[in-house]
Amino acid sequence: MTKADIIEGVYEKVGFSKKESAEIVELVFDTLKETLERGDKIKISGFGNFQVRQKKARVGRNPQTGKEIEISARRVLTFRPSQVLKSALNGEAPPEDHAEIDAREEAAADAAEARGEDFDEEGMEDMEG
């Protein structure tokens, strides 16, 4: 799907003109981009969370030569889908209280981040019942 496809969808479903639809879509993407550039998290209920994470500089290895190389510190964008989206992708009924499950996942992810760890969602499935 492209940005043009999204604009077309807004045009067809909402009834705005194509110009208005394009302006709305551009505004949404600009807002998302600015939020992420500030380092703020984006939480979209029933869809997922976008977050910018800081990666530390580290020593890596060139796979072709085996030579060690410095990989500089950088910011990376991560996306964690909600339980509702994961269920939809797997053809399952959405969880009864997806907001509660999303909140538990978010709390677990925040706790892992505070400890300097990556969040592993696989363990969360046991908590979902």
Curated annotation (Swiss-Prot):
The annotated region (Disordered) lies at 87-129
Q: Tell me which InterPro entries the record gives.
A: Hist_DNA-bd, Histone-like_DNA-bd_CS, IHF-like_DNA-bd_dom_sf, IHF_alpha
Listed Acidic residues bias regions: 118-129
Q: Which GO terms describe its biological process?
A: DNA recombination; positive regulation of metabolic process; regulation of DNA-templated transcription; regulation of translation
Spell out the Basic and acidic residues composition-biased ranges.
95-117
- A Pfam cross-reference name: Bac_DNA_binding
What does UniProt give as GO cellular component? cytosol
Keyword Acetylation appears in the UniProt entry: no
The answer, when asked if Transmembrane is one of the entry's keywords, is: no
The UniProt entry, under Gene3D superfamilies, shows: IHF-like DNA-binding proteins
Sample GO molecular function, one term: structural constituent of chromatin
Keywords in UniProt for this one?
DNA recombination, DNA-binding, Transcription, Transcription regulation, Translation regulation
Function per UniProt = This protein is one of the two subunits of integration host factor, a specific DNA-binding protein that functions in genetic recombination as well as in transcriptional and translational control.
Show the HAMAP family listed in the entry: IHF_alpha
Which PANTHER family does this entry report, sorted A to Z? Answer: DNA-BINDING PROTEIN HU, INTEGRATION HOST FACTOR SUBUNIT ALPHA
* Subunit architecture: Heterodimer of an alpha and a beta chain.
Q: Into which family does the record put it? A: Belongs to the bacterial histone-like protein family.
Q: What is this protein called?
A: Integration host factor subunit alpha
Q: Which gene encodes it?
A: ihfA
